[in-house]
Amino acid sequence: RAKELERRVLLSQYLLAIQSAGSVPPQETGLTYNSWFGKFHLEMIWWHQAWQPLWGHSELLSHTLEWYKTVEPIAREVARRQGFDGIRWMKMTDPSGVEAPSSVGSFLIWQQPHFIYLAELLYRSNPDKKVIEKYNYLVQETAKFMYAFATYDELGVRFILKGAIPAQETLNASTTINPPFELSYWYFAMQIAQIWRERAGEKRNLEWDELIDKLSPLAYNEDGLYLAAENAIDTYKDIRFTSDHMAVLGAVGILPMNKLIREDYMKNTLQWIWDNWNWGKTWGWDYPMTAMNATRLGEPEKAVEALLMNKRTNTYLPNGHNYQDPRLRVYLPGNGGLLTAIALMCAGWDGCEIENPGFPKNGKWNVMWEGLSPMP
């Protein structure tokens, strides 16, 4: 298993340095051939490039993030047209920043906090005032939209997220309330935006603090399993809810554990997904997402197994490309997710005291690495 992991890790670094470090965000097939009409997807930039500052290559990510500045007026107009403050980052777009029409993409929101997360990774790799000066304006404007998008539920005395299609795209925008990954991401990114205000010498936004304090906890069922959304009460009975991305695992994995989540319920959820998920309907980045969740929950054997699970969409060809199907023989978000997961499994995260937390402690693994940084 170690030899195959090394092969995938080495080849992925080359493939991503060539194809996921340009002046604009990469499309999912990089420069090899066109996918989705040559458009790129902003919810994928985290998967393509979050690994770069964690592996000591911040300059690659900062090069791409310059593009966000050029399309800020377009993103601001998207938010204004929809009645929101701040800027709303597009889902599917091109170098010009024009939003591509879509009955799904226009309702996605998980691309929104990515800019805050990626800017924070750049700051952590180089905690210099110049980084704050360079990115803080867009961090704050991104957070303004996030606050405006959340709805205050006076009856429940809480903030909710609705009117969106989650990362698990099998759910409806019109009925979905409080998808778990997006809730956790809102909690994380709004906190980071406040920290950036303090780093810039500004006061915390009290309204944002109220959102952070009153954001809804993740919804669960009577078996202690987290739901695909608060309204998705049939999550574990309807195959629509157990196909596509198991985004609930991203709530802890991509993101750190937080007060919205019970660790025991998340462990229950991981085990159920492990045993029962419709793995034939997954994508390449679902496996590193599962590995990161398992790592943070203290399940290193599952972390390794997730990265090497014998499924079609977790296939890595001799050239290192993450094969999905005959249409998508190249899928770089899978490669990027692999490198991010390996960074977490080796270097851990803030407050982690376990050496190489993503690898089993059975005496069979001798893990050596250098130059990796912990995740938040």
Task: Name the predicted role of every residue range.
Residues 1-39, 58, 68-76:
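Acidic/polar, glycine-enriched structural segments that form the non-catalytic walls/loops
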Residues 2, 24-37, 71-72, 121-129, ...:
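Primarily short, surface-exposed interaction patches in extracytoplasmic proteins
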